[in-house]
Structure formats: C-alpha cells, structure tokens
From Swiss-Prot:
Residues 452-478 are annotated as: Disordered. Vacuolar antiporter that acts in low affinity electroneutral exchange of protons H(+) for cations such as Na(+) or K(+) across membranes. Plays important roles in the transport of Na(+) and K(+) accumulated in the cytoplasm into vacuoles, and is involved in salt stress tolerance. This is Sodium/hydrogen exchanger 1. GO terms for biological process: positive regulation of response to salt stress; potassium ion transmembrane transport; regulation of intracellular pH; sodium ion import across plasma membrane; vacuolar transmembrane transport.
Amino acid sequence: MGMEVAAARLGALYTTSDYASVVSINLFVALLCACIVLGHLLEENRWVNESITALIIGLCTGVVILLMTKGKSSHLFVFSEDLFFIYLLPPIIFNAGFQVKKKQFFRNFMTITLFGAVGTMISFFTISIAAIAIFSRMNIGTLDVGDFLAIGAIFSATDSVCTLQVLNQDETPFLYSLVFGEGVVNDATSIVLFNALQNFDLVHIDAAVVLKFLGNFFYLFLSSTFLGVFAGLLSAYIIKKLYIGRHSTDREVALMMLMAYLSYMLAELLDLSGILTVFFCGIVMSHYTWHNVTESSRVTTKHAFATLSFIAETFLFLYVGMDALDIEKWEFASDRPGKSIGISSILLGLVLIGRAAFVFPLSFLSNLTKKAPNEKITWRQQVVIWWAGLMRGAVSIALAYNKFTRSGHTQLHGNAIMITSTITVVLFSTMVFGMMTKPLIRLLLPASGHPVTSEPSSPKSLHSPLLTSMQGSDLESTTNIVRPSSLRMLLTKPTHTVHYYWRKFDDALMRPMFGGRGFVPFSPGSPTEQSHGGR
C-alpha cells in the first residue's frame, strides 16, 4: 500500500514537472515570435534594433515572472553555458562562415587577424593587469591570479551584432568585413584563451609557464582551423562522389547540416575551439560542398542556415534578458551593492580602455603597410571599429558562469559579485551602447547609415571563390590573374601573389577532387548538369 502511494505521488510530481516544462516552452516560443514581430516593426527606429528588442522583452518578462512568483524566480529556463555552447552558438558561427563574403574577408584577412587575435591578446593583458592591480586591493573575496586572468579573457569577448545590423556590407564592404571578421576571430581567441588558462597552475608564473601557455594557445588555434577545413572538405568529397541529390535532396541537406554540427562537437570533444572549427567548416562548405548539391538544395541550405542563426541569436538575447533578474544570483551580492556597482563601473571602463589600447595603434600599423588610400582605415572607421567592440554579450556571460559558479549558483561573495557585475556590464553595454550605435554610425558614415533591410547575404556571396581577384567580379574566371614576376611583388603585394598561387593550386588539385563552381566533372543527373547545360 505504501509503495502504491509513493508511486502515485511520484507520478503526480512527474506530471506536474512535465506540465511546467511544456508551459515554459510555450511561453518562450511565444516570446520569440513577439521578438521577431516587434523587431520587424521597429526596424526603422533610430535607437532600437532586434537585439535590444529581444533583451527588453526578456527583462520585462523577467519582471513579470518575478512579481508573479513573489520574488522567488524571474526566468522560464535557467541559463546554462552548456545550452549556449552546444546548441545556440554553433548555428550562429557556422552561418557566419557560410554566408561570409569571402572576397572581402580574405582580402582583409591579415588586418582581421591583427585585430581579432593580436588585438584580443592586447585587450586581455590590459584588462587582466588592471584587474590584478585594482581588484586585489578592494577586498572582493577569495579571487586569485587565475580568476583575474579569466576576467581578462571574459571581458575581451566582444559582441558586434548591434553594429553589424546597422552597417551595410554592400555600401561599406571594407568596414563590414573588418567588424564582422574581427568579431568571429575575437570570440574564438577569447574562448581559446579562457580554456588555455584552465589548463595551467597560474599561482606560480614563470617564463616556462608563459611559453607553454602560448604554445598551447597556438596549438588550439591551428588545430581547430585544420579540423574545420577537414570536415568541410570531407562533406564536399562525399556529396560529390555519391551525387546524393540525384536521388534525394533531403539527404544532402541533412548531411551538410549534420557534418557541420559534427565538426563543432568533435572539436569540443578534442578540447579544441569549436567556434574556429565550425567557422572554417562553413567557409569551406560554401566554397566546395554548396556547389556540389542540386539547385533546390542550394536555396534550402542558404535560407535554412540563416534562419537557424537568426532564431538562435534572438533566443540568446531573450534568454540573457530574462535570466539577468534571477534573484538567486543577486541575493549573494545584495549586502554589498555599492561595491558591486563600483566593480561594474571599473570593468566597463577597462573594456573601453582595453578596446582603445589596440584598435588605434593596430590601425596605424595596418595603414603603414597599405599603399592604396581605399585600403587604409580612416579615423572615422577606426571609431566605428572601436565602438563595435564595446558591447558584451552571451559569450561573456557564459564564460563568467563557467568560471565563477559552483553547483549552479555560487555561495562565495567574490564569485557572486563577478557574476552580477558581468550581467550589469552586458546589460548596460548592449542597451546603452547599442541604442547609440545607429545615430553614431549615421553621424560618422552618413552615406551608409541606413538600416540593413536585405537578407543576411545575397546569393552572389555564396558564388564567390575562396580568394577572388581584388577588382573583379565574384564570378570571374581565372584568366585575368596576373602572375607575380618577382620577389619584390611578393613583398609589396602579398595578397595578390598568394591569390595567384592559391587559384593555381585550387584549380589543379582541390576542385577536381572536392568539386566547386565550374570544376565538377559532368555526369548525367549530377548536380552540375544544369550548370554545364547552360554554357
């Protein structure tokens, strides 16, 4: 009898829990729909964009739930860095690589790497050293050198979504490629830095530890990139050889999606950077795999990846806004509100300084290597690049949760203050800086200060070769590529020279093996039948 009562109670509890989950999911999906509708209606608004709209809706929903539960809870779901890194981040980063305009991205690759990798390292050291000097004297709690270095990595991760939503990549392709490319490389570098810090004993730092740390950092960077390229090439080879689309377009679309996700998860399994892996997987897939599938699959994959990325981004901002008011996080820091506000202000100031510490000096160095005036970064563009990296987003929150939480919510004052301070910086920078982005860009770039109303990327961007000619069309042939005549040309115009040898290598070896535009052998019923028939 007792067992039957216990089983009945357990069943009732399970049913109640199940019902609550279904209600939460329904409400969250409804909120996502509201974010999309309101974001569309406010598209022309001077101050608000879709990201800020989702954040505001999340905050308002959190307030309503907080009032309805009498201060016990403010969220439908608990923020989980696992949910963020495993399910939400992969489609966003993959689509960034898949839809990127490769002509501009690789044309400015050295500058992007300079800002995204070297610049992030400068920002990391600036914020870390300042945090050690300032916070160690403020009696925050039991924070050590490793925690302060982690703070540097956490607040070096930018979120340039607000700026990218305002910039038009057709009107300002150079600036857009710099902001976009730096944002992706920055996130990858910050996460690689953060993960590398967890593998070392940072209590006793000497030259050997620093060298080992740098070696581990470059190993993660290069290995992750190689894995992404390998996964993209493997998908291209399989689809090209099997001609899956001849029998089922669903299978080739599914294979592209699953192999892209597999590359990310495999990188995480091997303790590499999933962001770098899936980003370069997206670039390689758009260069080879996408041209090996049928025309209907090309349209499907292009819009499917863009839609998944858009939903994930909206989900993230809604998620962050709703979870920001979680009472369980704030109650441990509530007895020191002044100190929490002071730390948030200091961190915000360090973000501003750390960003300026590399944007303007590195822009100056980059301009020294450029001959053409249109390739140099003007001071107005430098201000936009600096501003674009001031916002902090879900990456910073996820890393902060990973570092400063224990068993869900921390009981330590120092850790609690760092969590709440991170949330404060993210909310303030996204809301305040984000609202000022449109007016600022309209002031600095009046000719291109109109909201982007087009699709995330035009079909043309998916046809562009991996490295295209500097002046020509994305679809041009290789006949107009000038062969470099001397070592001097290699030194003075390295991009053109690398482009020439890359195209020779790509045409001779890569495309015959992995496919790509115009280089897949004709076979009746194959994905290239239509393209050959139209010639």
